[in-house]
Amino acid sequence: MSSDKDIQKRRFFRLTYPRTAQPSLRNDDGSSYKVLEVSEKGLVLELCSGEPFKVGDAVCGKILFHDNQSEYIEGLVYRLDSRGAVVTLNNNISFRNIMREQSYIRSNFPLFFRQKMVGKPTPENSSDDQ
């Protein structure tokens, strides 16, 4: 039997990026943000001090993935937390792009990928994401 801890409670798989592989989001207003996590229906954007996001703000722009593929997204800031701005999307990020990104991270950052998949914390400046 599985415990509640072992059961995936999210509807969509989340892909967390190592620091050196984070794609950028070019917002329609010209600003640019690092993408920390991505799923088909949401993402987490890195916030630097003084960033203008508030809960409910619209986010529209293009994500540029590692293979130079891009995808236009539209969504709203759902919440702000210690990681950054959590954005729920009105449109899906394609499953194909999610899988390509997962494959890239798995191939190029195997230790990072394994640590994230088994839920072990990754040190901020670990050598596995270089």
Residue spans of the language-model regions?
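N-terminal helix initiation/capping motif
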Residues: 1-38, 103-130
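Short conserved beta-strand and strand-loop elements enriched in small hydrophobics
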Residues: 20-26, 56-70
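Short solvent-exposed strand/turn elements
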Residues: 22, 49-55, 87-107
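Residue-level marker for the onset of beta-strands and adjacent loop->beta junctions
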Residues: 31-32, 59, 71-74
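Mid-chain, well-packed structural core segment of small domains
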Residues: 64-88
